[in-house]
């Protein structure tokens, strides 16, 4: 089978390399022509057919052509100006970026032909200083009345040789100051609570012995009451005396003294020691159900 001849395409490696070489050669030639015949950028015009920049200066004998890259290089490095090699320092020392920025803005304004813009700060109004007599009069009126009506403000301003606006602003500032003082006092009270109150507590026991004040002992004295019950003849007029002492008896103490009920014939533990007058005696032979 016969091999077909290899057709050269514009996308082959050789064509691409050849195209790059041609572009480099044309760029070098254009730069050489530009340095040989310097022409200002304003005399360049673009040929719409070829896409190249051509010189419109008829005084030039040799026309030249350049590319977009050449124009950009011309804008960054104008022809005829000495180029400072990188790494060198000028006699005036290091360049200050802030100074360069200011000089650039100034040159731009001058180039455009407009006036140089100078930023000036707005002038602040002078602060009104009140005399001591005026301050005392304003403080006295503020204690009497925190808010003033327009006629009252006008009258006070004329009396103190001030304007109504000055009096109005002074009262506003004074109200704000008093409000801030109240808030600060509230925060101080909340941050530092009041000291705890002392409460007097009576001492009941001291060194294992009861210790009562006379006033307390009067409330804990003996309780006496007379029994008004007269349904039984034997108990008529028998006083009931129950003494509640303030001292507590120990659990191991013996039985206390007999009460009048026990002495009358009733003991708290069981039957009476002897039958009473009108109560019939229980027969010994009768058993309980």
UniProtKB/Swiss-Prot annotation:
GO CC field: nucleus
Coarse class of the protein's main subcellular location: nucleus
GO biological process entries: apoptotic process; atrial cardiac muscle cell development; cell population proliferation; digestive tract development; embryonic heart tube development; epithelial cell apoptotic process; epithelial cell differentiation; epithelial cell proliferation
Keyword flag DNA-binding: yes
Segments of skewed composition (Polar residues): 261-274
Keywords for the protein's UniProt record, in alphabetical order: Activator, Developmental protein, DNA-binding, Homeobox, Nucleus, Transcription, Transcription regulation
Gene3D superfamilies: Homeodomain-like
Family stated for the protein in its record: Belongs to the NK-2 homeobox family.
PANTHER family for the chain: HOMEOBOX PROTEIN NKX, HOMEOBOX PROTEIN NKX-2.6
Function in brief: Acts as a transcriptional activator. In conjunction with NKX2-5, may play a role in both pharyngeal and cardiac embryonic development.
Protein's name according to its UniProt entry: Homeobox protein Nkx-2.6
């Amino acid at each position: 089978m016969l091999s077909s001849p290899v057709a050269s395409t514009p996308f082959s490696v050789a064509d691409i390399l050849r195209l790059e070489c041609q572009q480099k050669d044309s760029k070098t030639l254009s730069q050489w022509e530009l340095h040989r015949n310097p022409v200002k950028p304003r005399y360049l015009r673009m040929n719409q057919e070829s896409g190249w920049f051509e010189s419109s200066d008829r005084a030039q004998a040799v026309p030249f052509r350049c590319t977009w890259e050449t124009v950009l290089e011309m804008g960054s490095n104008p022809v005829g100006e000495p180029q400072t090699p990188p790494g060198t320092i000028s006699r005036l020392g290091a360049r200050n970026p802030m100074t360069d920025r200011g000089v650039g803005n100034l040159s731009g304004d001058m180039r455009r032909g407009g006036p140089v813009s100078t930023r000036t700060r707005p002038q602040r109004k002078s602060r009104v200083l009140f005399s001591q007599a005026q301050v005392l009069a304003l403080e006295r009126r503020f204690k009497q009345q925190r808010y003033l009506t327009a006629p009252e403000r006008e009258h006070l301003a004329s009396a103190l040789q001030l304007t109504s606006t000055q009096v109005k602003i002074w009262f506003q500032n004074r109200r704000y100051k008093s409000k801030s003082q109240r808030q600060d006092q509230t925060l101080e009270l909340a941050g530092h609570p009041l000291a705890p109150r002392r409460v007097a507590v009576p001492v009941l026991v001291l060194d294992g012995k009861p210790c009562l004040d006379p006033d307390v002992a009067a409330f804990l004295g003996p309780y006496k009451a007379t029994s008004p019950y007269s349904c039984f003849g034997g108990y008529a007029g028998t006083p009931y005396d129950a003494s509640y002492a303030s001292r507590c008896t120990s659990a191991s103490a013996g039985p206390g003294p007999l009460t009048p009920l026990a002495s009358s014939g009733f003991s708290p533990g069981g039957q009476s020691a002897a039958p009473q007058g009108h109560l019939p005696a229980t027969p010994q032979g009768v058993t309980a159900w």
